[in-house]
Amino acid sequence: MATKKKTNFDDITKKYGAERDKALADALALIEKDFGKGSLMRLGEAANQKVSVVSSGSLALDIALGAGGYPKGRIVEIYGPESSGKTTVALHAVAAVQKEGGIAAFIDAENALDPEYAKALGVNIDELLLSQPDYGEQGLQIAEKLITSGAVDLVVIDSVAALVPKAEIDGEIGDSSVGLQARMMSQAMRKLAGHINKTKTTAIFINQLREKVGVMFGSPETTPGGRALKFYASVRLDVRGSTKIEEGSGDNKTQIGKITKIKVVKNKVAPPFKVALVDIMFGEGISSTGELLNIAVEEGIIKKSGAWFAYNDEKIGQGAEKAKNYLKEHQDVFDEIDHKVRAAHGLLDDSEVAETEEETTASKTKAKAKKEEKAVETEEIELELED
């Protein structure tokens, strides 16, 4: 049996010039031989310099994320209080992946997924891979097998808090289980992170909030499952419902949704701390017309004067709800404004930008012609009245 040649550390010295270049080339060749091609490369040679993304399913959130969506091959954590819209945000990502022809899996550790609600959000429930594991290790092992297959584009785990270790389930209520879940999650993160990166799978972990006891200063809020997920996540989103969306007046007022604030508290692929405000409507999910209207007004694409909203000098509604209904009924106008907003935030490629510019020019020409036509009609009416 051949013995492995030992390194003589006495011979290790700093190299310079041609000797250094040869030493580096030899080291690279040895690393490639021992660990495989691509195990070490110059950053400029890397094929994945630009982070590729999958859409979050929300325009406002895509903009807040900076890169245009959730990064592929990375871990994302979505956390917040109960009923804040965490699962809704994740399901919109599932729908967006399926819309692009991708495969998504949902590991429902909480056993609380509503198929009808998922369907209303645009999820193809016939194609969605669903698992309801008996214990935490089983759920994470299923996730690992899906990720290492390289066939799945998105895996959602709902939720970390519900991934209960088998030892805790097999034990009695009241038995001490300190640190079991944290150790399980720490081991899972160490194993999954590399596989997720290699297969370019996006893994979304939904998490709940807990409160630390005896905290005098700072926020007492924390997330279960230990610290591993916080460290391994490239993106962390804090989801909180803020303002009620109501219809009717007086005693007849009914809540039909809520304005939800999504804060990007950690982002390794773009500047963090951006905020997305989305309208989550009950039974419908994130309102695409609502978020588009808000962003377009901010960008000056849609003009707001008092309660009136106007696009290309044409009024589209008095009040936000009427303007949203107009955009729902006029898909061509919705698509045109959507393109302009995406172009303004750099979410389009070069060909789409050129297409948007052409559409904008055509739209302006059409609006100008319509305005001139109206002016001619007015002039003719005035002449008739004079006669």
Swiss-Prot record:
Q: Which GO terms describe its biological process?
A: DNA recombination; DNA repair; SOS response
> Which region ranges are annotated with the description Disordered?
348-387
Q: Which InterPro entries match?
A: AAA+_ATPase, DNA_recomb/repair_RecA, DNA_recomb/repair_RecA_CS, P-loop_NTPase, RecA-like_C, RecA-like_N, RecA_ATP-bd, RecA_C_sf
Database matches in CDD domains:
RecA
Per UniProt, ATP binds at 80-87
Q: Is-annotated flag, keyword Nucleotide-binding?
A: yes
Q: Name one GO cellular component term.
A: cytosol
Supply the alphabetized keyword list. ATP-binding, Cytoplasm, DNA damage, DNA recombination, DNA repair, DNA-binding, Nucleotide-binding, SOS response
Q: What is this protein called?
A: Protein RecA
Report the source organism: Lactococcus lactis subsp. cremoris (strain MG1363)
